[in-house]
């Protein structure tokens, strides 16, 4: 979800939206490799994205988001919120696999199609399948 959250935040900021990126970790993109995370955070900060670390969403109403600090349970109230975009709870898209399984003898499934996860895992999946063929 780190990749998705950073990408959506950047897209919205480029389109002129005011963006506040809340993350449960210490920084946005915490699990992304350091060289990418730092570069991407620089882009986001340069576009005016406000990054709010160590929080989780616990409620919302018409124009307010209610966050809770994951490290001390402090509550934060974020006003003037038009839209909340969640980058969590991903589900694999196996539609293509299902179509191919009836047409091909062997179908290898990798990446997010196999299970929602990071890009490095998808590359490793591809390497393993490629080496086994």
Each model region followed by its residue ranges:
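A conserved FAD-binding loop/helix module that cradles the flavin
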Residues: 2-11, 15, 27-33, 95, ...
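A Rossmann-like FAD-binding core segment of flavoenzymes
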Residues: 14-99, 103
